Amino acid sequence: MTSESYITKLYFKKYFLILFPIAVLISTIGFILCFFVFQDNTTLCILTNIITTLSIIISIAVPALLAYTDKIKGKKAFEIFRTEGFTCKFCDAYRKIYIDKGNPFPLHVIMCASYYGKISEHDTARILLNKIRNPKKLDSYSRFMYYLEMLSMCGKTGNWCKGEEVRKKNIGFLQNYVRKHKNNPELRVNMDIALALIDSAHGHYGDAFTLLNSGYKPKDKNDENFLNILINAVYIYSLAKNDDNLSTAIINAETFLKNFTAFDFPWCKKYYEEQIIRASQGKL
């Protein structure tokens, strides 16, 4: 699910930058009015401080309230996600809450596309991603996620030509973003997987495996990043019709999954089992 703290940050970035200058303007107008209405300096100072304080409180409270409202709205979708996982029901609920009404944050649109992609609704994912008209104007995290989802969607649908275009134009940004956030290895893993999907769609299976074998080591036996690498290896061997290595890749993924001792949600084990099966059939 989309990070609540990051969504809160986006609300503050969007509305505080609008409301704070208005607050300053109101304070200035209030000072001028008080200056002409009240000649007493003490009264003038008190009223000016009150107006300034209220203006600042409003400029902070409004984005905070909107972020809280966003969180409340998302409870229904999160409850479906918590109990059922990535399902059409969850994706539709998320879309209804965040996308179909009002002016959604681009990050909500991108994440909704990602969720549809996880249930192989790639046409819907493409429609949603096409709503983002100018990704270079997004904040860096949203922009990074947008390119990952575009690459992933193009790779899974075989549209390597469009994927290579996205890759060529934005690989510098993607690599720089990963370097700046090297304390978050999940970003590097997801980037390498997305790029590997483009290579595999183009038939460059060796390049795809070079990306998957970029040196990431599992941090423990419950490492979902490493499991995703193994599942995508199954998928790429299936596309390459390399049956011997496919059998080994399936065993590797199933064995690593069996060693898991903890999942974030009860449905995760079954979800990953199904992903391994689908990947072995050349589907993701």
Where are these regions (language model features)?
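Long, non-transmembrane cytosolic or organellar matrix-exposed soluble domains/tails
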Residues: H204-L284
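Hydrophobic alpha-helical transmembrane segments
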Residues: I32, Q39-I57
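Flexible helix-coil transition and linker loops at the boundaries of alpha-helical arrays
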Residues: Y94-G102, R133-R143, F173-P185, P218-E224
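Helix-turn-helix repeat elements of alpha-solenoid scaffolds
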Residues: A77-A93, G117-N130, N159-F173, S200-N213, ...
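"A position-specific structural signal for the A-helix of alpha-solenoid helical repeats
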Residues: K75-K76, L107-Y115, S142-M153, L187-A201, ...
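Juxtamembrane interface helix immediately N-terminal to a transmembrane segment
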Residues: T2-V24
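Transmembrane-cytosolic junction motif
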Residues: Y6-T8, F38, I57-F86
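Alpha-helical adaptor scaffolds
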Residues: L148-N222
